[in-house]
Regions:
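Hydrophobic residues on conserved beta-strands that form the core of alpha/beta folds
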Residues: 24-25, 89, 119, 133
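A conserved, well-ordered hydrophobic junction motif at loop->secondary-structure transitions
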Residues: 40-74
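Short aromatic-glycine motifs in intrinsically disordered, low-complexity regions
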Residues: 8-18
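Catalytic strand-loop segment that frames the active site of acyl-thioester-processing enzymes
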Residues: 19-54
């Protein structure tokens, strides 16, 4: 799979989430410590109300951007995408909420990894406008 990845079926092989909770539709860039994921907000999105993408959807999109980055890493290493969880949101600042038709680009940077816990900083843009930023810890579920 070569970047950018915008095919919905390919994205689904990289993340554990399934419709209607899928909040990423593109992986634009990838390095082992950074990535850029995207989402175009559509009217049928579970987190859209009155044409606005809600805070909870934005946070879920950010978490799934991290999951997509991790899933691509596992794909490159010939392993299935693991299940993960938001461990903690250390801080998040939301300057504005996107609207239907907006395309989100979330830049993630891995700050630290220890065992199955990853500390990530993130910034989400619509065009050149920063709409959200913060830090999040994610935790991988143990393999069954």
């Amino acid at each position: 799979m070569k970047l950018p990845i915008t095919d919905k079926n390919k994205i689904l092989t990289l993340i554990p989430q399934r419709t209607p909770i899928v909040m990423v539709d593109a992986l634009w860039e990838y390095t082992p410590t950074e990535g850029v994921a995207g989402l175009t907000v559509v009217p049928s999105n579970l987190f859209v109300q009155q044409g606005v993408f809600l805070e909870s959807g934005l946070i879920e999109h950010i978490a799934q951007s991290i999951a997509l980055h991790k899933g691509y890493y596992y794909y490159l290493n010939g392993k299935p995408a693991p299940m993960g969880y938001i461990g903690a949101i250390k801080k998040i600042e939301i300057q504005s909420l996107p609207k239907v038709g907006d395309t989100l680009k979330t830049h993630i940077t891995i700050q630290q990894e220890f065992m199955d816990v990853t500390l990530v900083t993130m910034q989400t843009f619509v065009g050149d406008t920063l709409i959200a930023q913060g830090e999040m810890k994610t935790v991988l579920a143990p393999n069954p």
